[in-house]
């Protein structure tokens, strides 16, 4: 069992600093890539990725004038009730049905 946490994305949300949030996201991406590479070599490994909460409610969009300029803005400096994503990388050997009473 290995758990990896990246507090950088949380700090970026609390501080309303998109550049910090992006840096943390890139670090998580690197960690996930490493875990998936390991799982591909060791087919009894399951990789799960999620977050414990969302912070800042970052929104992104594009302007009309000038066209296509990226705009990023936060709605808060606190944790939000927004749902977070859950991803899994499953090999054929680790794929099986888990009765819902055993899933948290």
Model-derived features with residue positions:
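A post-motif C-terminal structural segment
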Residues: 1-104
């Amino acid at each position: 069992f290995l758990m990896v946490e990246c507090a950088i994305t949380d700090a970026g949300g609390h501080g309303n600093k998109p550049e910090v949030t992006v840096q943390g996201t890139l670090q998580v991406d690197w960690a996930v890539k490493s875990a998936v590479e390991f799982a591909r070599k060791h087919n009894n490994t399951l990789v799960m990725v999620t977050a414990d909460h969302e912070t800042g409610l970052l929104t992104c969009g594009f302007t009309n004038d000038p066209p296509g300029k990226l705009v990023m803005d936060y709605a808060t400096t606190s944790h939000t009730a927004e749902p977070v994503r859950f991803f899994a990388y499953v090999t054929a050997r680790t794929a099986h049905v888990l009765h819902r009473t055993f899933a948290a």
